[in-house]
């Protein structure tokens, strides 16, 4: 009931008839999970949302994937955070959308949400050797969008210049598969 009321209020405030995507951010508590999923299904059936999804991580997100009722999933993925790589492929085979967060490893070390461990793996794997004139962020973004089953990636930004650089980088397209394979090989060697 709270989910449905919240969506109705949002629709009124947004002055629209439906949401494009409605997703859980994190797993609902186990005791409310079935009811919460049914609420999303009801909202979709009633035309209040076009698509439903879940934003979570393994292992929790696997339960929702197994339900086979969701249109999209959001989770982290990059060269430095590849835990969900095979899940992206699996979802692509099911025709389910994937929204990637953390596609450039959550930013620069020492700023924002960056994980120094991830960037330490970059250094251990000597990935700077593969940059070929790119900076690390362009390289990571282009690596992320190289996954053939990925639907889209969400890139956070601290300023408009970041947005311009990210759009330019994405416009250059994915990295060569041979480069991506070398990244995976090097990172596996330091894992």
Predicted features along the sequence, with ranges:
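Glycine/proline-rich, positively charged
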Residues: 1-79, 86, 96, 146
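Generic, ordered loop/turn and secondary-structure boundary motif
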Residues: 80-81, 105
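Structured C-terminal cap/extension of enzyme domains
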Residues: 86-191
